Amino acid sequence: MIQAAKIIGTGLATTGLIGAGVGIGVVFGALILGVARNPSLRGLLFSYAILGFAFSEATGLFALMMAFLLLYVA
């Protein structure tokens, strides 16, 4: 019974990865639109996009870490 609860909790914790995937898509979609509108700002926009990617990926990694903690530690 406890093992089933761990597996269900792990599955629910991994839903945070959905938000990270959507966030990364939004960041790079905005980068493409921004470069298409003003190509001279490509370097600046790319650095902002990498920063946004890192923050989005960090939230996804936190969700994955919580899932592993629920599965193997709790």
Swiss-Prot record:
The chain crosses the membrane at residues 16-36, 50-70. PROSITE patterns: ATPASE_C. SUPFAM superfamilies: F1F0 ATP synthase subunit C (SSF81333). One of its GO terms (cellular component) is proton-transporting two-sector ATPase complex, proton-transporting domain. The record marks E57 as: Reversibly protonated during proton transport. GO terms for biological process: proton motive force-driven ATP synthesis. It is a multi-pass membrane protein. The keyword Glycoprotein does not apply. Keywords: CF(0), Hydrogen ion transport, Ion transport, Lipid-binding, Membrane, Mitochondrion, Transmembrane, Transmembrane helix, Transport. It is found in: Mitochondrion membrane. The keyword Mitochondrion applies. One of its GO terms (molecular function) is proton transmembrane transporter activity. It comes from the Eukaryota. It holds the Pfam family ATP-synt_C. Belongs to the ATPase C chain family. HAMAP family: ATP_synth_c_bact (MF_01396). F-type ATPases have 2 components, CF(1) - the catalytic core - and CF(0) - the membrane proton channel. CF(1) has five subunits: alpha(3), beta(3), gamma(1), delta(1), epsilon(1). CF(0) has three main subunits: a, b and c. Mitochondrial membrane ATP synthase (F(1)F(0) ATP synthase or Complex V) produces ATP from ADP in the presence of a proton gradient across the membrane which is generated by electron transport complexes of the respiratory chain. F-type ATPases consist of two structural domains, F(1) - containing the extramembraneous catalytic core and F(0) - containing the membrane proton channel, linked together by a central stalk and a peripheral stalk. During catalysis, ATP synthesis in the catalytic domain of F(1) is coupled via a rotary mechanism of the central stalk subunits to proton translocation. This is ATP synthase subunit 9, mitochondrial. It comes from Trichophyton rubrum (Athlete's foot fungus).
